[in-house]
């Protein structure tokens, strides 16, 4: 068994060359900011949906409480259970809509893996953003899961229904663009991402906006009022 062992234990070393992407990970109770690893030529979507393992390795990690965003701990390496990951995005894909602690300069950890380290890792400053590799239709949807609601565009193959995309067992995470994430209990806008991945296991309801009727007073379910129309 080959392992890198030093006074801090076993560190993570990719067995094949991968790109390091700074990621934002949201679980029910935690916010995790750190580096995840993607094979060259793969998108983050491809990497997560094709990984047969149960845990995602993350390095250079900062962990915050999801409720009050208070810093909890920092680690050079953790493993996050896929079943607990609700949302995951490249950090650079998040718009700055408010001050958050993980964007503070003092929050930057000392990197475990640096550009001059020979660990089979490429450091990408911006990572890989979402590109549709097969023609798909963008469908504006509201997605509910627990106390989170996400409004944004899901993608459906032209000869598929939305139901078919959601029932695709190969899609552990569903890509969404122009995604706004709200806390349902107070309708607060938490994050706005040009691209994020939603854990299929965490979804309670998916509602295409065009299919919703009635009047809504919540920001994550915008419904065109029919009042005054003949």
Task: Please state what every model-predicted region is.
Residues 1-230:
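Conserved RNA-binding domains used in RNP assembly and mRNA/RNA metabolism
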């Amino acid at each position: 068994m080959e392992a890198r062992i030093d006074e801090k234990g076993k560190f993570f070393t990719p067995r094949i060359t991968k790109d390091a992407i700074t990621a934002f990970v949201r679980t029910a109770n935690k916010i995790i900011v750190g580096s995840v690893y993607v094979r060259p030529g793969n998108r983050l979507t491809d990497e997560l949906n094709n990984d047969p393992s149960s845990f995602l390795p993350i390095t250079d990690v900062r962990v915050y409480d999801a409720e009050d965003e208070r810093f909890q701990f920092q680690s050079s390496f953790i493993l996050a259970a896929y079943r607990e990951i609700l949302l995951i995005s490249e950090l650079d894909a998040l718009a700055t809509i408010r001050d958050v602690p993980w964007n503070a300069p003092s929050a930057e950890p000392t990197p475990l893996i640096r550009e001059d380290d020979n660990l089979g890792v490429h450091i990408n400053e911006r990572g890989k953003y979402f590109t549709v590799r097969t023609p798909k239709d963008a469908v504006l949807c509201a997605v509910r899961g627990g106390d989170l609601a996400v409004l944004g565009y899901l993608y459906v193959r032209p000869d598929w229904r939305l139901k078919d995309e959601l029932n695709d067992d190969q899609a552990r995470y569903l890509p969404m663009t122009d995604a706004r994430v709200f806390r349902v209990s107070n309708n607060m806008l938490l994050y706005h991402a040009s691209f994020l991945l939603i854990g299929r296991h965490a979804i309670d309801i998916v509602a295409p906006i065009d299919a919703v009727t009635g009047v809504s007073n919540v920001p994550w379910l915008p419904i065109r009022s029919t009042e005054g129309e003949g």
